[in-house]
């Protein structure tokens, strides 16, 4: 509960109580039917206007007091000539010898500054001026519209020196507190700041009107449906504001047919949709929040179209939200292709064909099942993934992925290319694991996993081998296969999805030697990418690095060089080590349509750690350990991501084309 002097904020709004003040709240009007505050002031002014119209032009008899209204009975005046000018439009004018401002009892005001403020508001009414009823009416309006007075009564008094026009004003009360009801979303500090210097001063209707506009603007800027629906001054100088906020009454889900648009029975469980919404029953209706909820449902990948329509509930300030959903087909088969990360010589050896089956809404609960097979001349990958994007009963949006994979990939990244007397080496891996991921800050997410891997090298006939042509060992244990149980911890930061944003990935893997023959090592990697907009161009800087400590398989060393590393070199041709560092910079510019031109430069090094890899595969093959490349390229946007074609030179003046799909790692 926030406090400020004698300001006290309560749960349903704000309250600045006055000592011994007991306001009698009036029923609040509805959100849409409420008028601006102090409508009674307008009615009072109209009454004054009618009184002035009756009094000034006629022949009165005497002056009398009539209580709080302080109405004046005019005295006799001589007949006046009609105004022949354009200003009065034919109205009779009365010559005024003196103009004064007094309190409603006819006595001078206690505060001279109030008398000066009322006098300053007068425009037409000046001493020795011939006035019409219209001009007096306009000055009455000006005095009241100054915001300091609750009433203003013009009184004409016949004196020895002529007609004396007295404006009898009633100032507003001094401000001693504020009661604000219904402001559940409005921060208490907002009104504290608006009234912090007004305590003990005359309530100014102009200032109050500005506060009301700022409150309404606060709701509008944040996409909230809310406004000040009523305002009044209570006894004791207490201001009462009634705020009406649209409240969510119910959220109803309606599935529509993809073809006809008619209501149909959906496959998705309603609770699966509702748990993804940040808008809840009983909350204030927030248009921006509802828009984000629509985007969230679309990112689930199971809906083709989502709309949320608010509908008013009777005469209340509540709304029902109707969510119209069009479901996508739940699953199906697909086929495609790609390029191996371990491209070898030959026109077709780097190409991969793929076949997959996916079901994106298992059990109608947004669970994902993917079964894929990739096959190339050398590569072969069978993968089974089952993902629960949001575990039931968890309120932190934790996801779970279960994975099983059997793969055979080229060993050329670490163990070089073919030799006349020795065929290509492939690395076979059988992997199974489970991972849990969740966001833990607005732009941060984390992953914790446990993965088991059974991996080893094979010759061109598929037979297990433990040494290559250079007599370098291919496994860390000396057996045909290395077994590893990895505990994985990963943290990812990204501030947006575009390429001109910041991304940081930090990963730790620890081998757990539960059995004596299982490998024990620690691997740490990090990647950083930062983009900048420079006029029509875009600068992208990236860096990555890592280190392995312990007993690990040679084929798990860091490979440097290639399309996603140092361009201008073949895959893994710069080196392979226990440690590595790679930096890259590129400037891209849109040429026309989806075509983009790129200029780039890369540098990578194994930080002199190549000989520390078991068997020293980089030293046996004469890899330099460091190198750089530069070149130009073009990119074309496609449904699969950017298609990259690049032509690069390395520091050995060798030239090489690189082709890739998607953004560089």
Swiss-Prot record:
GO biological process: chloroplast organization; embryo development ending in seed dormancy
Domain POTRA: 246-328
UniProt-listed InterPro entries: Bac_surfAg_D15 (IPR000184), BamA/TamA_POTRA (IPR010827), D15-like (IPR039910), POTRA (IPR034746)
PROSITE patterns: POTRA (PS51779)
Listed Gene3D superfamilies: membrane protein fhac, membrane protein fhac: a member of the omp85/tpsb transporter family
Keywords recorded for this protein, A-Z: Chloroplast, Membrane, Plastid, Plastid outer membrane
Domain of life: Eukaryota
Pfam families, alphabetized: Omp85 (PF01103), POTRA (PF07244)
Main location: plastid
Any one Gene Ontology cellular component term annotated for this protein: chloroplast outer membrane
Compartment(s) where it occurs, according to its Swiss-Prot or TrEMBL record: Plastid, Chloroplast outer membrane
Additional detail: Probably not processed upon targeting to chloroplasts.
Family: Belongs to the OEP80 (TC 1.B.33.2) family.
Name this polypeptide is given: Outer envelope protein 80, chloroplastic
Organism: Oryza sativa subsp. indica
Gene: OEP80
């Amino acid at each position: 509960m926030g406090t400020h002097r004698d300001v006290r904020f309560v749960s349903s709004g704000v309250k600045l109580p006055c000592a011994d003040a007991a306001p009698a709240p009036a029923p609040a009007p509805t959100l849409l039917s409420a008028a601006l505050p102090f409508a009674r002031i307008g009615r009072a002014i109209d009454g004054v206007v009618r009184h002035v119209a009756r009094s000034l032009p006629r022949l009165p008899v005497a002056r009398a007091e009539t209580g709080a209204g302080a109405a004046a009975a005019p005295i006799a005046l001589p007949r006046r000539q009609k105004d022949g000018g354009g200003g009065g439009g034919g109205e009779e004018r009365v010559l005024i010898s003196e103009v004064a401002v007094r309190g409603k009892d006819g006595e001078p005001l206690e505060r001279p500054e109030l008398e000066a403020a009322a006098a300053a508001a007068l425009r037409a009414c000046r001493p020795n001026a011939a006035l019409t009823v219209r001009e007096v009416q306009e000055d009455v309006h000006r005095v009241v519209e100054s915001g300091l007075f609750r009433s203003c009564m013009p009184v004409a008094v016949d004196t020895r020196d002529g007609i004396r026009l007295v404006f009898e004003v009633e100032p507003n009360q001094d401000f001693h507190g504020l009661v604000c009801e219904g402001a559940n979303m409005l921060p208490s500090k907002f009104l504290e700041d608006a009234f912090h210097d007004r305590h003990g001063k005359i309530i100014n209707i102009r200032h109050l009107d500005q506060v009301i506009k700022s409150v309404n603007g606060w709701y509008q800027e944040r996409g909230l449906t809310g406004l000040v629906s009523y305002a009044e001054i209570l006894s004791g100088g207490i201001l009462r504001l009634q705020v009406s906020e649209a409240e969510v009454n119910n959220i109803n889900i309606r599935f529509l047919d993809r073809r006809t648009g008619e209501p149909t029975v959906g496959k998705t469980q309603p609770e699966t949709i509702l748990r993804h919404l940040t808008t809840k029953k009983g909350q204030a209706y927030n248009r921006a929040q509802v828009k984000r909820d629509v985007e969230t449902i679309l990112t689930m990948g199971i809906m083709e179209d989502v709309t949320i329509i608010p509908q008013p509930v009777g005469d209340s300030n509540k709304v029902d939200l109707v969510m119209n959903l069009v479901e996508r087909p739940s699953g199906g088969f697909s086929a495609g292709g790609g390029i191996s990360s371990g491209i070898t010589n030959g026109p077709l050896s780097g190409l991969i064909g793929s076949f997959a089956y996916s079901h994106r809404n298992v059990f109608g609960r947004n669970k994902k099942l993917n079964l894929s097979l990739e096959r190339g001349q050398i590569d072969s990958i069978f993968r089974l993934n089952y993902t629960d994007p949001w575990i039931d009963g968890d309120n932190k949006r934790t996801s779970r992925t279960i994975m099983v994979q059997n793969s055979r990939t080229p060993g050329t990244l670490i163990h070089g290319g073919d030799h006349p007397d020795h065929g290509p080496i492939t690395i076979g891996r059988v992997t199974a694991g489970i991972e849990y991921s969740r966001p833990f800050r607005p732009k941060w997410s984390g992953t914790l996993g446990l993965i088991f891997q059974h991996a080893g090298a094979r010759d061109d006939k598929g037979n297990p081998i433990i040494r290559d042509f250079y007599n370098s060992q291919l496994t860390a244990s000396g057996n045909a296969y290395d077994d590893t149980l990895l505990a994985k911890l990963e943290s990812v930061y990204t501030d947006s999805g575009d390429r001109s944003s910041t991304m940081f990935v930090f990963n730790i893997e620890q081998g757990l030697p539960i059995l004596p023959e299982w490998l024990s090592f620690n691997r740490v990697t990090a990647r950083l990418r930062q983009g900048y907009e420079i006029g029509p161009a875009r600068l992208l800087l990236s860096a990555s690095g890592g280190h392995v400590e312990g007993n690990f398989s040679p084929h798990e060393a860091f490979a440097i060089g290639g399309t996603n590393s140092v361009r201008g070199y073949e895959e893994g041709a710069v080196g392979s080590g226990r440690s590595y560092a790679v930096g890259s910079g590129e400037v891209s510019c849109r040429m026309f349509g989806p075509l983009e031109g790129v200029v780039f430069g890369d540098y990578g090094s194994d930080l002199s750690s190549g000989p520390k890899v078991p068997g020293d595969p980089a030293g046996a093959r004469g890899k330099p350990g460091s190198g750089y490349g530069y070149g130009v390229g073009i990119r074309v946007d496609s449904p699969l991501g950017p298609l990259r074609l690049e032509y690069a030179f390395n520091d050995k003046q060798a030239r090489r084309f690189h082709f890739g799909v998607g953004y560089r790692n």
